[in-house]
């Protein structure tokens, strides 16, 4: 549905071609630690990382406008190169953006090679976020590769009332000794088995994406599944079996994630 010019964010803005709400059509800054550009509509695919929200605003200005940072959810992803943690972070941002939220998604790399540890981040908020930094005290942590528990302090800064979601076939209590005394909630899901079952290969990022949505409720599950179906049908237009496999992955992961 097109938005009439008089409802646009700018007086002389062009008519929308994306069918998004007026909030989503607001002029957005798209930036990352490597690129900065400006876009006026949602892109189909992403660069390395994006911040989606209207024009930048300082923390002092946000206080004057009464912005409540308690409405913000911060998520940190831990994985290895090639496992899709960065892609999952971007897809989560896409789904949250389409539900009318302000979002950030960006990665942090070490050595850029397959199998090397990487970190990715999400901020999801009901209001614009003036923060432009890594996330040091996340509400949620997603661990895409269980072996990282032995070498990386994945719970660093994780809020005690938050949660960690780990890709593992082991029960949560068996993994607690590796979490360096973290007292909060621990969820596990065998993302590898789920992806092998529905996709015939090891793609843990798809089940882990669904698991963090189920645990955090940063996006309504129904909205999330609807947006993901639309994205998959666009990306894999000539591969209906791949679309259905991914959708089955998401649905089973949301059911099977356990505390």
Language model feature labels by segment:
Residues 1-30, 34-38:
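Cationic, amphipathic, low-complexity alpha-helical segments enriched
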Residues 14, 18, 36-53, 65-66:
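Positively charged N-terminal leader segments that act as targeting/secretion signals
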Residues 24, 48, 62-63, 87, ...:
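Enrichment for repetitive, rod-forming helical segments
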Residues 68-259:
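Active-site cofactor/cluster-binding pocket
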Residues 30-31, 40-41, 47-48, 72, ...:
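Alpha-helical structural elements
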Residues 1, 5, 17, 66-68, ...:
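Polar/charged alpha-helical tracts
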